[in-house]
């Protein structure tokens, strides 16, 4: 049922008995207020410097542009429009020019203080739009200017605050002083509170040994923090790589996507320990898987000790050539045979995976040298079936001694392995020539120059195997089988 409109009261001279009664009736239609009161009205005009507000007073109220918003240097047209209903606080009923001066932002400020004080009392969060970046933090519009220190924006300090402009942020009120017009906020406190339950649930589901994907969120001297999806875990510098590194930035950068293994979850301290290297193959296991005892491999002398020489055969893999395995003759000190930095072809004589040790021999590598090139000796492993027959590479036809069509990738891989084996053989040949020249020149001298120096690219560059070489290799292998 519709309610009939009630007409506004009309005042006429005939309605009242006297002029005094008439003035009293008019007086009742005029609003009265004092400085500091909050009044309501309708925007009737918007100029560049001020806004006119009809509040039912004898004159329209004036809101200067600076009193429209807590933002600085605003365009009135961006804040209000004609016809808007707004609240304003009376700054002065009559200035020197007889104008009623109002403030929209002060009315908003007074209303906001009551709301904020209530939220602070209940320990609840406040929402606001970031309107400024100032020295040391952000300014939020929460009905008044709330200050959010940079150190309290996130769980860790944020360097660039510009991306937060215009964003709505929820934060806890940690300091409130109306007399000083001071409101300090903390988004970190809000994050800690709201994420506590989420973190607990996440940590409860995170099991030791689990493999997770994450993003590197920050790097410190002792490791890298990885965001697993709301919870950060630490990859200690010792768990970043199998090889020795001086700083985490040698392995990862902020923003990198990584796969890590969960090493430990400390529920009490809410800390997660992670490992990047645990998701990668141990280089020692890789070496043991790809090398056999008896193979001759290239290396570089890295260190001399009284009992022998250490030779690096792969990144992160060093083996010992005992002094007794340096040469056939008696050697007093290792530098009679080799020097740090020398390239050397050595034979793998033992692999101890549990103790992460490999034993190498320069002497046996030279003893095993034959002028006929044998790829199997230099890392090109042979494969045989249960009957002892050699297994040829996929795509190679042993009957025609040719590669089949469609196996270009397999052929390229095989030929690359062949070329590498041939390169190692040439390095070994150069080493043998140097040893022979040294023995002939020294003829009994106890001092010998290093086993080898870095051969030229021309001397050591491997070449791809031709079909004729493949056929010859097939005949050799078939004969030895």
UniProtKB/Swiss-Prot annotation:
PROSITE patterns: S1. InterPro entries: NA-bd_OB-fold, Ribos_protein_bS1-like, Ribosomal_protein_S1-like, S1_domain. GO terms for biological process: translation. Residues 437-465 are annotated as: Disordered. Residues 36-105, 123-188, 209-277, 294-363 form the S1 motif domain. CDD domains: S1_RPS1_repeat_ec1_hs1, S1_RPS1_repeat_ec2_hs2, S1_RPS1_repeat_ec3. Keywords: Repeat, Ribonucleoprotein, Ribosomal protein, RNA-binding. GO terms for cellular component: ribonucleoprotein complex; ribosome. Residues 445-457 have a biased composition (Polar residues). SMART domains: S1. It holds the Pfam family S1. GO terms for molecular function: mRNA binding; structural constituent of ribosome. Belongs to the bacterial ribosomal protein bS1 family. Binds mRNA; thus facilitating recognition of the initiation point. It is needed to translate mRNA with a short Shine-Dalgarno (SD) purine-rich sequence. This is Small ribosomal subunit protein bS1.
